[in-house]
């Protein structure tokens, strides 16, 4: 699980880490990338990596979550076209997940994105008559 604080320094470190992972994926399969590789490429300390992520897979989960957030925020083209367009342009993450048998990360990210939007719409239709916690459990 990733756990990122919302301050400029943490967000800057996270961007460096994400960029490093994407760059490393261009030359190595995910299974061969180490935290030390990411640390060297990103110039952030090992402790900074672990302050924000528990594993390399968590970096990919964040990238997936960001992708689905971007897809959901888009407009114009039907959502399925936006999905294919996004992943066509961001194939490194998708390939890394599929090659390592971790498509579950992608599926979980998609489920979280869709669930949140569907839950909010349903809560709105019910006139906010249930608590946020109860609505999330439905």
List PLM regions with ranges.
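Primarily secretory-pathway and cell-envelope proteins
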Residues: 1-6, 46, 73-92, 102
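Basic, helix-initiating cap at the start of DNA-binding domains
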Residues: 1-28, 32, 37
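Residues in the recognition helix of alpha-helical DNA-binding motifs
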Residues: 20, 52, 62
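Short, hydrophobic secondary-structure boundary micro-motifs
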Residues: 33-34, 95-97, 106
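Short, basic, alpha-helical segments at the C-terminal edge of helix-turn-helix-like DNA-binding modules
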Residues: 34-35, 63-72
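Short hydrophobic/aromatic patch on the recognition helix
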Residues: 43-53
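Amphipathic alpha-helical packing segments from all-alpha helical-bundle domains
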Residues: 77-85, 101-137
């Amino acid at each position: 699980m990733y756990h990122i604080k919302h301050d400029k320094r943490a967000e800057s470190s996270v961007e460096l880490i994400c960029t490093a992972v994407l760059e490393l994926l261009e030359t190595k399969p995910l299974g061969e990338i180490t935290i030390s590789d990411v640390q060297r490429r990103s110039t952030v300390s090992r402790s900074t990596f672990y302050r924000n992520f528990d594993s390399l897979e968590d970096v990919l989960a964040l990238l997936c979550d960001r992708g689905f957030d971007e897809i959901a925020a888009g407009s114009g083209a039907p959502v399925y076209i936006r999905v294919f367009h996004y992943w066509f342009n961001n194939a490194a993450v998708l390939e890394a997940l599929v090659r390592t048998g971790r498509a579950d990360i992608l599926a979980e990210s998609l489920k979280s994105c869709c669930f949140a939007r569907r839950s909010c719409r349903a809560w709105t239709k019910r006139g906010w008559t249930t608590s946020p916690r109860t609505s999330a459990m439905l």
